[in-house]
């Protein structure tokens, strides 16, 4: 920060206002809504975005999520288990779409600290227009969960747009779904017109 201030002070940009901020802490994603929050709080010379900073209390409140992907872009998110093949399959899928169709394609892969057995998230976008959204997907048209235990740990279904599709890999029949699916998941599926499918991919 001090190096930047010193460099600008001795240039034609000496009257440019400079802010000091922290982002990406703990490998947190930086979203368009957080960037807008920075511009909306230019009276503050220091800030933190992406986390609740209870040490310096410099966190900025962010508004509703902002979607910058072109209209007609399909957003997909896949929740997998480290080394279960989900990431590899999605890398192949997005390459096939990019190489063999007239669509633009983009993929990001998010992991926790464990190499094997940890949570993996694959974020895939594809569509007819160029995609310049350099952040992870927070509202998806399609969400797939490849590990049934995740439905009790993560808010996956809530990441879907109204009318989106949720695919769950599980061995449960209707009775099992009634027993294992959390109440808030059932309520969200019903209230937001989510198309829900199951597949037993481990059978």
Tell me what each language-model feature is:
Residues 1-2, 6-11, 72-82, 86-203:
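Active-site cofactor/cluster-binding pocket
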